[in-house]
Design a protein with these regions (language model features):
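Bacterial N-terminal signal peptides
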Residues: 6-16
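Positively charged n-region of N-terminal signal peptides that target proteins for export
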Residues: 1-4
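N-terminal pro-sequences and low-complexity stem/linker regions of secreted or lumenal proteins
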Residues: 403-858
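Predominantly soluble domains enriched in secretory-pathway, periplasmic, or organellar proteins
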Residues: 20-430
Length: 858
């Protein structure tokens, strides 16, 4: 036994490694991106974040995003709540018994909320919008649904989350996250007895042993004070800091009577508090702080904060553990915390005053944990339920800890989180310095974010690298600039988007991490879909521009996260024609919910609005660039949003993409002919791939790297993703990485050389018309709609698509439409659409088993 880990080592017998721990039979070598990645075990699997999965124990697949877990029938049955079903498993064998679809399928399950009564059979589940689902679990694990209970009080969406049941199982206290209330629900009568206001977005709930006190975590803290900054979330204003990140988290104490609720106190805890866990015998309450990388420990007798536990295995690691689920050992000495940000469970020794937690490797994105009979059960949001025997010998403890650290690249992250390791005076400038703070030959970074294309859709016909011409939708005639840029500078054919739609895609592109508030809320609609409009969605690390400003860098934004552009009854054709005629007859207004971004944004640059051509966006930027040329100053970091490759319904898909291509070419040409070109790097990528077609996988996309220092004509097949871009930007600008996931990502040295070529880029004009309209009577011609002639149902589905915001559409319908337009008469290759993973295995990468479920836009 080791002194550093007494609580865990005293639990039970030695862990027995299952087949899941043995080397993979495929024989494929891991992708070797850099020296630090060469050291990982050959059986590890890489996920899109660049992290490895080295899961120990058994892992059982359950469909959907996995959200919560509890035991039933005296611990014999393990229940797992997902976005779509309540699943039951034999806790001993981990055999999946049943997947019971929720009674209200369209509502699904909310991101939290599953409770089992003391009888071990009665179950209550929080639905996605307005209802609680009641069920009975038999001794054999079979689930039978009972009557659902409407807890909405007439509201459209209250989004119930945490649930706690009274000892007799007759009543429940339920967090109503959208109305900021705690409800007392009569489960027998099937009605809400009363409600009480608590903090913003109540999340987790626990009930004292006597049933007289409820403890409620408020994910958004208290309502903002009169002098505090505030931004919206779910119809409620949230107190925020200057970055528009939530200012605080709180815990409410609520007195519970037979038919009454009364808030009796409130205590500040960590940021984004989620699950609460009551240890009644020891008068302790644990609160997981997703945004605080910590667990708050409350003395329930005094109602005061007794200590804060750091869930980082090393205090110097960057922010980003994303601590969510909690469980306590039977002896009360070890707290288990699900660290979703590093795919591990942290084991915290509560008997030690200060002790760094040891780690147990989990699956992808652990979100809930439970402990019973010496076994740890982990619900991994992205890839299944895990069962592992808790280790009792020092060797296994050390092995698990080392494996979890290696899989999450913690040593790599720690190295770069600590800042400069050598003096800048002794290092020669290079494009991507080896260490934080060393000089870069690049001074200005331009980051261009576009919408929704895979690698094969655009570059499948490029004639080199891992490309598939049979899947290209927008060939050289449509995208001559994309092709020319990828041919002149590096072609990256192993690059991936971390997200699956614009909601999490823009988060990955600008924050490099996504918390459980979004990862778990796939059908519950607590988290706003439009990224940039929900303050509780924003990660504790802030955005890349916050990071740059914090480190004294200058910044300018063109359109990113301006989701509220308003038009005055104008169409794409109106803007296109007005621009050709000299302008002045069309107008729009912009608006931002992120105050810090508003202050650094070009007021005349439109954000999301498919009726505005990307040519207009290029015009505005180039005018601004000309003014900066005269002033002789250009920002250290510039973000430009060019969204029209998303496509919409007014024009043909090729016209939208050609418009986007020409705008990109014009921007690149303008920058390359400017006085700032000599020390500039431009990164161009998509926010997400929109489950499009690609022969490797639907997450594979393209990244264009443009610079005098970018390698000419190089083929770069190393694994990169959106967090690689962010880490590279940070390194170039002399900043430490902004969070744990970014810190663990590879930087993109292989795309650059030390020899500059200042030759400017010359924009090419697409052969495709930029304003080719979709024929209104196309159903009769077969050209449009893109479905079999006479299929009015699918035609109606396309006509009903909502293009008012990014990805508010059914991906399959739009993808079928684009395919039929661009490759008329050819069979739709459904097998290569979305997250199919057919080409990942050969690259040492892993398919998310639940990715197909993720790809559906809400």
């Amino acid at each position: 036994m080791t002194k550093a880990y007494p609580a865990l080592l005293s639990l039970l017998a030695v862990v027995a490694l299952t087949a899941a721990d043995k080397p993979a039979a495929s024989g494929h070598a891991p992708v070797r991106d850099a020296a630090w990645m060469n050291e990982r075990p050959a059986d590890n699997k890489m996920v899109y974040s660049g992290q490895q999965l080295d899961t120990v124990g058994q892992l059982v697949d359950v469909p959907g995003r996995l959200l919560a877990t509890e035991f039933a029938q005296g611990g014999k049955i393990l229940l797992v709540k997902t976005t779509t079903v309540l699943a039951s498993l034999d806790a001993a064998t981990m055999k999946l018994i049943q997947k019971a679809d929720f009674p209200i399928a369209k509502a699904g399950g909310s991101m939290h909320g599953l409770a089992v009564a003391a009888d071990g059979a009665s179950v209550v589940v929080s639905g996605g919008r307005t209802h609680l689902y009641r069920a009975t679990v038999a001794a054999d694990g079979k689930i039978t649904w009972g009557a659902s209970i409407d807890v909405s009080g007439g509201a459209k969406n209250v989004n119930p989350l945490g649930i706690a049941l009274t000892a007799d199982g007759q009543k429940a206290v339920v967090a109503l996250s959208m109305t900021n209330q705690l409800a007392l629900v009569d489960l027998v009568g099937g009605k809400v007895v009363t409600t009480v206001d608590v903090g913003v977005c109540p999340y987790g709930v626990a009930l004292s042993g006597d049933g007289k006190t409820a403890y409620v975590s408020n994910f958004g803290g208290n309502a903002p004070g009169a002098e505090e900054l505030a931004e919206p979330s779910g119809g409620t204003m949230v107190a925020v800091d200057k970055r528009t990140v939530a200012l605080r988290g709180t815990l409410s104490f609520v007195a519970v009577g037979a038919d009454s609720l009364r808030e009796t106190g409130r205590l500040e805890v960590g940021l984004h508090p989620s699950e609460v866990l009551l240890d009644a015998p020891r008068q302790r309450l644990f609160v997981a702080n997703v945004g605080g990388d910590s667990v708050s420990v409350i003395d329930t007798a005094t109602r005061k904060l007794s200590r804060t536990l750091d869930t980082k295995p090393d205090h110097d690691l960057p922010w980003g553990m994303l601590t969510d689920g909690l469980a306590l050992s039977a002896d009360g000495r070890t707290l288990f915390a699900a660290n979703a940000g590093i795919n591990a469970v942290a084991c915290l020794d509560l008997s030690a005053a200060h002790s760094a937690p040891k780690l147990i490797p989990a699956g992808w994105y652990p979100g809930a944990v439970r402990v019973r009979d010496g076994q740890l059960f982990v619900v991994n949001v992205r890839n299944g339920v895990q069962k592992v025997a808790l280790p009792t010998d020092a060797k296994t403890v050390a092995d698990y800890d080392a494996r979890a650290r290696a899989a999450a690249h913690l040593a790599h992250a720690l190295r770069y989180a600590k800042g400069p390791r050598t003096t800048t005076a002794t290092a020669a400038p290079v494009p991507v310095p080896a260490e934080v703070g060393q000089p870069s030959s690049i001074r200005h970074v331009v980051y261009i974010i576009k919408e929704n294309r895979t690698f094969d859709q655009v570059l499948g016909d490029i004639g080199r690298g891992n490309a598939e011409p049979k899947l290209v939708l927008f060939p050289r005639d449509v995208t001559p600039n994309h092709h020319a840029i990828a041919e002149r500078w590096p072609l990256l054919d192993n690059y991936y988007c971390n997200g699956v739609n614009s909601s999490d895609g823009h988060a990955w592109a600008s924050q490099g991490i996504v918390g459980p508030y979004r990862e778990k809320d796939r059908v519950g609609f607590r988290c706003a879909y439009d990224f940039g409009t929900d303050a509780l969605f924003f990660a504790g690390c802030g955005f890349i521009w916050d990071h740059a400003l914090l480190h004294g860098r200058s910044f300018r934004n063109y359109g990113e996260m301006d989701k509220l552009t308003k038009l005055k009854g104008k169409t794409y054709d109106d803007f296109f024609t007005d621009r050709q005629n000299g302008g002045g007859k069309t107008a729009f207004t912009t608006a931002f919910t992120i105050d810090a971004l508003r202050r650094y944004s070009c007021p005349g640059y439109p954000g999301w609005e498919m009726a505005i051509p990307d040519q207009t966006r290029a015009d505005v930027f180039l005018q601004d660039l000309a003014a900066m040329e005269k002033r002789g100053s250009f920002p250290d970091l510039t973000i430009i949003y060019l969204p029209n490759d998303h496509t919409a319904g007014e024009l043909t898909a090729k016209s939208y993409v050609a418009d986007n291509d020409l705008a990109l070419g014009r921007v690149i040409e303008g920058l390359s002919k400017s006085r700032f070109w000599k020390d500039m790097a431009i990164f161009v990528n998509e926010d997400d791939p929109q489950t499009g077609g690609d022969h490797v996988d639907g997450h594979r996309s393209f990244c264009l790297v443009v610079s005098p220092y970018a390698k000419k004509g190089a083929l770069v097949s190393k694994f990169y993703n959106q967090t690689s871009v962010l880490h590279t930007i940070c390194r170039i600008l002399g900043m430490p990485p902004m969070n744990q996931v970014v810190a663990a990502s590879t930087t993109m040295e292989d795309c650059f050389t030390t020899q500059a070529d200042l030759t400017p880029y010359v924009c090419l004009t697409p052969k495709q018309k930029l304003n080719e309209k979709r024929p209104p009577a196309a159903k009769k011609t077969g050209f449009w709609p893109p479905f079999p002639v006479g299929d009015d149902r699918l035609t109606a589905q396309f006509e009903a698509l909502d293009f008012s915001g990014p990805d508010r559409i059914d991906d399959d319908t739009l993808n079928r439409a684009i395919w039929a337009q661009t490759r008329p008469g050819e069979r739709y290759p459904r097998e290569f659409m979305g997250a199919h993973g057919k080409g990942l295995k050969a690259l040492g990468l892993r398919l998310d088993p639940e990715a197909a479920d993720d790809d559906d836009d809400e």
